[in-house]
């Protein structure tokens, strides 16, 4: 099963709320938040720290060669985090999992040429929702396998039009639109997805 957590981090745009959150973060996360120049990025990073603490307590983390985090002392729990705008999402599973959220992204011609096969480009056309759908699905796949951008997105071939379910060997996707912004999930196999709405109030 995949547990998917969806969090609105906008309350942390308030400096007083952010100040309340900081002491509950570990030293590394506090320093990271304080280094970030933009209020939006501070809120996102602090929210990630609060959510991970809520889910995993004071767990130790390790990182693969491309920077994907994992729990250092567990090989039966995997997670992946994404944030955009006011939203943070985290997917937790007993298998490798990738998740991506993207708020209001306009079509970017350079990204289209570099990341999408010509057939995908034709399907997207001028439709920004289709652009976001394919982009988040590709991102979720890259995050699942932990490749970063060492795997060119253009080499990830999706069915057109894309569908939920298996769309490549050892890759199963979900494209979820029931929240304020769409979220893509990718796992190596089909699983049940249990959704959880979390608030900053729950975490403080």
Residue ranges of model-derived segments:
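Core catalytic alpha/beta fold that binds nucleotide/phospho-ligands
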Residues: 1-204
């Amino acid at each position: 099963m995949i547990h998917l957590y969806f969090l609105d981090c906008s309350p942390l745009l308030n400096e007083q709320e952010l100040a309340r959150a900081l002491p509950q973060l570990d030293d590394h996360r506090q320093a990271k938040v304080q280094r970030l120049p933009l209020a939006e990025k501070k809120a996102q990073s602090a929210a990630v720290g609060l959510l991970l603490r809520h889910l995993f307590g004071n767990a130790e983390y390790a990182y693969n060669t491309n920077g994907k985090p994992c729990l250092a002392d567990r090989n039966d729990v995997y997670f992946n985090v994404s944030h955009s705008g006011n939203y943070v999402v985290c997917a937790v599973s007993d298998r490798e999992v990738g998740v991506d959220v993207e708020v209001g992204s306009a079509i970017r011609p350079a990204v289209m040429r570099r990341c999408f096969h010509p057939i995908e480009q034709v399907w997207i056309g001028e439709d920004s929702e289709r652009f976001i759908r394919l982009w988040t699905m590709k991102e979720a796949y890259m995050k699942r396998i932990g490749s970063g951008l060492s795997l060119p997105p253009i080499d990830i071939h999706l069915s057109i039009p894309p569908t939920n379910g298996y769309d490549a060997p050892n890759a199963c996707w979900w494209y979820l639109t029931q929240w304020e912004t769409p979220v893509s999930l990718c796992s190596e196999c089909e699983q049940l997805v249990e959704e959880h709405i979390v608030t900053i109030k729950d975490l403080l």
